[in-house]
Amino acid sequence: METHIRYSRQDRTLILLDQRVLPTVEEDFYCNDVADTIYALQTMVVRGAPAIGVTAAYGCCLAAYEAGHPAPHAQWQKELDTLLEKLAQARPTAVNLRWAVERMRSVWKSMGDPDLNTLIARWLDEAEAIHEEDKSINRAIGRHGATLIQDNDCIMTHCNAGALATAGYGTALGVVRGAVDAGRTGITVIANETRPFLQGARLTAYELHKDGIPVTVACDNACGLLMQRGMVQKVVVGADRIAANGDAANKIGTYSVALLAREHGIPFYVAAPLSTIDRATPSGKQIPIEERPAEEVTHVGETRITPEGVPVYNYAFDVTPAHLIAGIVTEQGVLRPPYTASIARAFAAADKDRS
C-alpha cells in the first residue's frame, strides 16, 4: 500500500487517497494549490505525521507554482515564503509538517537566487526524495521492531500508524509487518477503534485485513479488560511528535493505554522516524495539542448525539511520559531510557551515516 500519496508532474497535481471515507469508499482527493493541501491536512484527507511531511513537501512545489502564477513576478519569493508559512501552520502537533517545509526551504536558500523554474525542478526532486526516504525508513523501523516481537504475540495498537500514515509500510504497523516478514508466526493485532475519528476501526483494520494479518477491533474502553485477561502481549503505537526527553505525543487516548499497559506489566513501545523527534522541544509540556471541531464528537454521521449547547473537549492528541515507554523504535534501532542520551546517540549515528 504505497500509492495513497502520488504526484503528477504533468498535471502539477498532488493526488491523495481520501482517508475520510475509507474503508467503504476508495476515492482520490486532488490538490492543485496550497489551499487544497491545507484543506486536505486539516480535514484529515491525509493524516499521520510522516504522511503529513510527505504531503507538505509536495505542497511546497504547489506553492512555488502558485507564487509564480500566471508568470513569475518581482514579488514571487515573498509570496512563496508566505505560502510556505501557511502550509507549515496547517496542523500544530505533527512536527513532520514543519520539518518538511523547513527542509524544502533550506534547499531553496542553499541555491542562492534561483529562478522559479529551476527551484521547482529542484524541489520536485527533493519532495520525491523525502517520499522514497520515508518508505526506506519505515522498513528499517519494521526490521528493528521485529526483534521485540515473539511468535503468537497479540499486539495492541492505537490510532493508525500504518502505510496510510506514512509513505508506505508504516511505523507501528511497520513493526507488525516486519515481524511477519521476519517469519514470526501466530501474530495478531488488536486495533483500538480510536474515537472520535475511528482511525483504528476504519484504517488500521482496513490495512491489516487487506494484508491478511489477523486483526480484531476493540472499543477504546475495553483496553483494560483485554489486558487484564492476558490477551495483549505488546503495545506498539506511532507518534506525531517526540520531545528531546522521550515524551511522545500521539492520538488522544494513547496515554491511557500506556498507563494500563504499565499496570499490567505489558511493554509499551513507540515507533517513529527520527524526523518525528523534535530536539528543540525539551519535554511533552511544550508540545502544542491540537483541538478539533466539536462536531466530530457531537455527531455520528449526520445525526447529533449530544444535547444542543453542551460543550465538548475534542483534543486530538495527548502526551505519554517517557517513563511509561519501554523503547522508541527508529530507523537507527530501538532507543532505550534514558532517552535524552539515546536520542542524541541516534541522531549522531544518522549524521555519521549521511557523511
Curated annotation (Swiss-Prot):
**For this protein, what is the EC number?**
5.3.1.23
Single GO MF annotation: S-methyl-5-thioribose-1-phosphate isomerase activity
Residues at the catalytic site:
D240
Query: Which InterPro entries does the annotation name?
Result: IF-2B-related (IPR000649), IF-M1Pi (IPR005251), IF_2B-like_C (IPR042529), Initiation_fac_2B_a/b/d (IPR011559), M1Pi_N (IPR027363), NagB/RpiA_transferase-like (IPR037171)
Q: Which Pfam families match?
A: IF-2B (PF01008)
Q: Which residues cross the membrane?
A: none
Per UniProt, the keywords (alphabetical) are: Amino-acid biosynthesis, Isomerase, Methionine biosynthesis
Q: In which pathway does it act?
A: Amino-acid biosynthesis; L-methionine biosynthesis via salvage pathway; L-methionine from S-methyl-5-thio-alpha-D-ribose 1-phosphate: step 1/6
Which positions in this protein are listed as binding substrate? Answer: R47, G48, A49, R91, Q199, N250, K251
The annotated site for Transition state stabilizer falls at C159
Reaction equation(s) it catalyzes: 5-(methylsulfanyl)-alpha-D-ribose 1-phosphate = 5-(methylsulfanyl)-D-ribulose 1-phosphate
Example GO biological process term? Answer: L-methionine salvage from methylthioadenosine
Q: Which family does it belong to?
A: Belongs to the eIF-2B alpha/beta/delta subunits family. MtnA subfamily.
Kindly give the HAMAP family that the UniProt entry links to this protein.
Salvage_MtnA
The protein's matches in PANTHER family, at most eight in alphabetical order, are given as:
METHYLTHIORIBOSE-1-PHOSPHATE ISOMERASE
Q: What does this protein do?
A: Catalyzes the interconversion of methylthioribose-1-phosphate (MTR-1-P) into methylthioribulose-1-phosphate (MTRu-1-P).
Question: How is this protein named in the record?
Answer: Methylthioribose-1-phosphate isomerase
What is the species of this protein?
Oleidesulfovibrio alaskensis (strain ATCC BAA-1058 / DSM 17464 / G20)
Gene name, Swiss-Prot/TrEMBL: mtnA
